[in-house]
Amino acid sequence: MTDTEKSFDPDRFPPVLEALKQALASIEEIHQRSLAIEKMVLDPGPMINNYYPIDVTYKGIIADKNNTPSAFILCANPMGKTLVRDNVEKAQAVKALLHSSHNQVIDLPFLNGDVNGVSWAIYDLNFPLTRNRWVWQLQKRLLIPVVGQWLTDVVAQTRKTIPDKAHPMAIFSPLESICCENEFPREMIKGAENAMKHLASGAWIPCTSLAHNDLWRGNIMLPSTARIFTRQFRVIDWAGADLYGIPFFDLFKFLQSFTVPRGYGKKMIQNHCDILGCRSMDATGYLLTALGVLGQNLNQFPHHAYVKLAKELYALSLTY
């Protein structure tokens, strides 16, 4: 695939933005919330390798008439028209899957639709976690237990045993792809080989569970009504979620991003193992399977970034 085929020309977006502003100006809820649509600016974020990938979305904060930030807008690009709609539909499916006590961390848009075939959505405003390293130490100390418990409960609510007939595609194939990756260390490949042996012998009976698949610090937010030091949180960006995903990938991404202390991390891993009915060594098999699935479905994710992530998460798993 050439850069032209996998990139998006930002010059194609201004007509979409103008059409979007016109469409929103006629919506009653926009007026009820006093949102200054005419002033909103949408940004695709930084370029990646000097181009915008075709899965880029435009984002912006919408202020009210008093210039107070009041809402968040997400809009697809003309080459990936359904990106935002797909994100919303996946979040709806996830919210419907979880118990009401656990699905409140998922915010759905209060408005969404299409303009010129390009999907968009507007959400109540949430706030990112702090970038101040001193504040972050206290913030994460409050959040690690509640996010960790939420993760454990989600696995408990959505756990399903994978039928034997599904093992070749669901487990063996991803693990074999790990073994075929030349840039992975021998120890990592050996881990995948051992996982396949445990599966073949029946010592490991794998399960699926809901997987967000990108559960890092940037996708955990604070609701606008919460204070900076809070145990309330929201999880955003469900586009890559899988209702029947591979356990442990979310957990290790979370442990990495939040630099969770070893003792607490070991407890969280054991909680997952207890729910899934597996041994602690099988956590590595789950992680490598999830990494294999990711490697088979990179889409716009650069291969070098995948290799780096996989090595880091595998190395992290050995420390627990």
Model-predicted regions and their roles:
Residues S209, D214, N219, D237:
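Conserved catalytic-loop position in the HRD/HxD motif
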Residues A226-I275:
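Active-site Asp-x-Gly
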Residues A23-D43, T161-H212, P223-T230:
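An alpha-helical support segment within catalytic cores of ATP-dependent transferases
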Residues K266-K267, Q296-Y320:
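ATP/Mg2+ or Mg2+-diphosphate-binding catalytic cores
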Residues M1-M47:
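Juxta-kinase regulatory segment immediately upstream of eukaryotic protein kinase catalytic domains
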